[in-house]
Amino acid sequence: MNRLFSGRSDMPFALLLLAPSLLLLGGLVAWPMVSNIEISFLRLPLNPNIESTFVGVSNYVRILSDPGFWHSLWMTVWYTALVVAGSTVLGLAVAMFFNREFRLRKTARSLVILSYVTPSISLVFAWKYMFNNGYGIVNYLGVDLLHLYEQAPLWFDNPGSSFVLVVLFAIWRYFPYAFISFLAILQTIDKSLYEAAEMDGANAWQRFRIVTLPAIMPVLATVVTLRTIWMFYMFADVYLLTTKVDILGVYLYKTAFAFNDLGKAAAISVVLFIIIFAVILLTRKRVNLNGNK
């Protein structure tokens, strides 16, 4: 093999090796993206026998003039901010607790990540069962046992309580990702740094601010960036839990399949992509994802 490519550029051989991956990437990513952008400029009927109509930027104009879109965008921003902040803080707190030796540490760590590796549909079913107004454990405790309220609330049928629950569900569901990431970097910090800071009279908060925070900052930036992207694109968890919280993913789905407006739905997805791309660019200007500022 060395003789075969001796004295020649490795680029053709590298492209040959990359060709299957590039074809797969083009077929699964590039082509659907181009098709989606094309659809966003069309009025596309569900009946394949009816020809689509080019409408220019009409779908984008309808989005920007639709109060429902702005409401969904605002809900998505709040949802993303709360989930990212909550899951990151909780993941860091649990990681710091586990960054020490104690009995059954590995078993406890496995239990912590259980919510992250369990299929969403199973977790959604468990939550809807717990908050069921007829036989759920939450309403049993609140009504029958503690008498906190007279009548069992319809948790997932009220927009306010539904939003709180989907946020709590997402924090609990996704904090193990932050936990694993932070625990890995915490275990690389030299313990002597904490000992030296303690000898200098630093309290727990000062040790965290001076020693821990600078060490975990690259990982923190990566976790926040990735979780922000993933939560902005969220659909399945919220849609399975309730129909009362119209974040952008749910709003897009309803536009496409409830109202059969595929052109507008495609335009929404393009706008969503632009927002996410802008967030990535702004984040990369502040923090290099490789850990170099």
Swiss-Prot record:
InterPro entries: MetI-like, MetI-like_sf, UgpAE/MalFG_permease. It is found in: Cell inner membrane. Pfam families: BPD_transp_1. The keyword Membrane applies. Residues 34-77, 132-135, 184-214, 283-293 are cytoplasmic. It is a multi-pass membrane protein. Probably part of the binding-protein-dependent transport system YcjNOP. Probably responsible for the translocation of the substrate across the membrane. PANTHER family: ARABINOOLIGOSACCHARIDES TRANSPORT SYSTEM PERMEASE PROTEIN ARAP, BLL4140 PROTEIN. This is Inner membrane ABC transporter permease protein YcjO. It comes from Escherichia coli (strain K12).
